[in-house]
């Protein structure tokens, strides 16, 4: 569908919302259409309609792992703000996808629940964490998940068991579909040490990563048997700046926004890193989602 086509939405929408406000990178121009959903019913209605109209759209949570274009997005941005949770049993919890993943980790660990302590150091939403199979070191969301509910193109809610989620290193089935992750059910255990484990993990993250500056987290996936940040550092690129974007001097797998960075500058830095490492026989793959102004 062409952008110029007039759309009459059966629900309220906003125009010209700046995506920089919905990105931890603080980069991004205005969205053509923008809609915040706060319930499963709202999400079902919006998704079914967008698919029926074949209108281009993206789903955004806390915006912690994406780079929006300076021009914005020539389509529909569906902002997920569904933030409920409920215990299904003493050690099983269902959490809706718009909730902060780090908040969930802090809440559970401080209440004596183990299984998601690593979440305290991961910005973003529960849905985003499922989408990326977020984790730290050898811990990831796949190790604690029991099932996921998602909304398909017909607006129907479907359930996937853990074995159906195609989890891999920073991968899930949802990266190859446009299903809306609605909720995740986690298996936990009771532990008196959970709060200390969470505190230690968070402290390590704060010491090693540039959390005081806007960024999108790790830019590249770690290649097998190595660390992208270490390779970028050894290539002499740590601290390299281009305009307002800089390869962090604290952790070389982060690009930070020094207050005036553009998406073009960030993408240029990413390409510089890729080219430099490629010349050494190393191929790096982006972990950050680069969202173009117009979908292909």
From Swiss-Prot:
Co-factor requirement: FAD
- In this protein, the active site sits at 170, 218 (proton donor), 287
Tell me where in this chain the FAD-binding PCMH-type domain is found.
26-191
- InterPro entries (alphabetical): FAD-bd_PCMH, FAD-bd_PCMH-like_sf, FAD-bd_PCMH_sub1, FAD-bd_PCMH_sub2, MurB, MurB_C, MurB_C_sf, Oxid_FAD_bind_N
Q: Which reaction does it catalyse?
A: UDP-N-acetyl-alpha-D-muramate + NADP(+) = UDP-N-acetyl-3-O-(1-carboxyvinyl)-alpha-D-glucosamine + NADPH + H(+)
Q: Which segment of the chain is annotated as a signal peptide?
A: none
The cross-references to Gene3D superfamilies, in alphabetical order and at most eight, read:
3.30.465.10, UDP-N-acetylenolpyruvoylglucosamine reductase, C-terminal domain, Uridine Diphospho-n-acetylenolpyruvylglucosamine Reductase, domain 2
Location, primary (coarse class): cytoplasm
UniProt entry tagged with the keyword Flavoprotein: yes
Relate the protein's function as given in its record.
Answer: Cell wall formation.
The UniProt family comment states: Belongs to the MurB family.
Q: Which named protein is this?
A: UDP-N-acetylenolpyruvoylglucosamine reductase
Query: Which species does this protein come from?
Result: Chlamydia felis (strain Fe/C-56)
């Amino acid at each position: 569908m062409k952008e110029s086509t007039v759309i009459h939405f059966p629900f309220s929408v906003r125009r010209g919302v700046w995506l920089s406000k919905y990105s931890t990178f603080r980069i991004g121009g205005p969205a053509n259409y923008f809609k915040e959903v706060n319930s499963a019913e709202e999400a079902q209605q919006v998704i079914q309609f967008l698919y029926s109209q074949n209108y281009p759209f993206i789903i955004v949570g806390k915006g912690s792992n994406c780079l929006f274009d300076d021009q914005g997005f020539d389509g529909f941005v569906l902002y997920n703000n569904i933030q409920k949770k409920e215990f299904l049993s003493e050690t099983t919890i269902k959490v809706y996808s718009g909730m902060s993943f780090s908040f969930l980790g802090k809440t559970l660990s401080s209440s004596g629940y183990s299984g998601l302590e690593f979440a305290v150091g991961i910005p973003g939403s529960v849905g985003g964490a499922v989408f990326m199979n977020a984790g730290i070191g050898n811990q990831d969301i796949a190790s604690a998940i029991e099932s996921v509910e998602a909304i398909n193109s017909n607006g129907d809610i479907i359930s996937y068991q853990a074995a159906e989620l195609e989890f891999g290193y920073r991968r899930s089935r949802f990266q190859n579909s446009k299903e809306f992750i609605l909720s995740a059910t986690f298996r936990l255990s009771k532990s008196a040490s959970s709060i200390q484990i969470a505190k230690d993990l968070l402290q390590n993250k704060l010491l090693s990563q540039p959390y005081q500056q806007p960024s999108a987290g790790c830019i590249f996936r770690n290649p097998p048997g190595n660390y992208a940040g270490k390779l970028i550092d050894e290539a002499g690129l740590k601290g390299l700046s281009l305009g307002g974007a800089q390869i962090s001097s604290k952790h070389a797998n982060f690009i930070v926004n020094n207050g005036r960075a553009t998406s073009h500058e960030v993408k240029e830095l990413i390409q510089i890193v890729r080219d430099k490492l490629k010349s050494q026989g190393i191929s790096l793959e982006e972990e950050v989602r680069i969202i173009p102004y117009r979908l292909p």
